[in-house]
Amino acid sequence: MTISRYINKGILFPVYKGLYSTVPIDSLNPLEIGKAVIHRYTYLTTESVLSHAGIISQAIYDYTFVADISKRVSVGHWSFRFRQLKNEYLHNPLGILNQNGIFVATTERAVADMHYFNPKYHFDIPENIDFDKVRLIQEEVGYRHARS
């Protein structure tokens, strides 16, 4: 059978270009979708992680990742934003956790990443940030030298 027949019979559900699921899109984990649609190494960071940690209080509508390309993707009712990060920074594992196959930045790595993209970014609750760890990550990853 061809893919279109599987779709017509309800066996496969189209998710994104060349990506299909055996369950309806609404039943999927949005972080898994975000990881899959980019087809390259990526990790969840910046606004998504900072909002979850209570560091920023504004509503976040996109799942924010970094990758080696910049891209915006919508799948179902979810939106994904991929910010481009140089490979030398992207592939540095400091402050990146593997949570069930999805790479997620720690709060401190997300702050360091945000400062890389926007050095003047305002954090609503900065007292919840360990800035010593942030500075260490910035030094180790190389961010401190990137924007000098």
Give the residues covered by each predicted segment.
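Basic amphipathic alpha-helical segments that dock to polyanions
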Residues: 3-14
